[in-house]
Amino acid sequence: QPVADDPNLKERIGYISDDVFYFPAATMEDMHRFYRDVYSRFDEALYQKLKEAFPLPTGSIRRFSKGMQKQAAFHLTLSARPDVLILDEPVDGLDPVMRRQVMSLVLSDVAERGTTVLISSHNLRELEDVCDHVGILNHGKMLLEKSLADMQGGTVKLQIVGDAPAGFPVLHESRSGRLNT
């Protein structure tokens, strides 16, 4: 049965997209009620506790800044207590202090509950502090997948003028004139 047709499976998955969506004119309290009704494992005590971490204004969430909308998404999604958390550009739009705080909350959830977190990001430096395993996708194809330590120790970017020498495993190649990367 596809995930989309299985409510028991869907409620175990939390997803925060780069471009978060909220119902038109929905307030944080409206979304709080919605999440509480949809997710049977919604943790009301955690939701109240996270209000300290995410001091959000009142009013329509769509009027919040991108960073505030992202904070609202983390507040709601973490309170739903998913087993798997899928994050697309999770800290995009957040200031540096909030970036650290959000990732700290996610890592605490991993440590306390064993949550599996999948992160899609273009900012690899940001992931070094929170990931233990990485994969590189290019146009939907997995180019490389290994532990972060192995990735850092054995993968390099090489630029040469002229043709690339034979015998080197190449994950991705681009060419500009005689410059191969």
Enumerate the predicted regions with their spans.
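ABC transporter nucleotide-binding domain
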Residues: 101-181
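Helix N-cap at the start of a conserved alpha-helix in ABC-type nucleotide-binding domains
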Residues: 96-98
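ABC ATPase NBD Q-loop/coupling interface
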Residues: 1-8
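Conserved catalytic motifs of ABC-family nucleotide-binding domains
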Residues: 81
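Catalytic Walker B motif of ABC-type/P-loop ATPase nucleotide-binding domains
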Residues: 85-89
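ABC-family P-loop ATPase nucleotide-binding domains
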Residues: 17-73
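ABC nucleotide-binding domain signature
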Residues: 13-17, 135
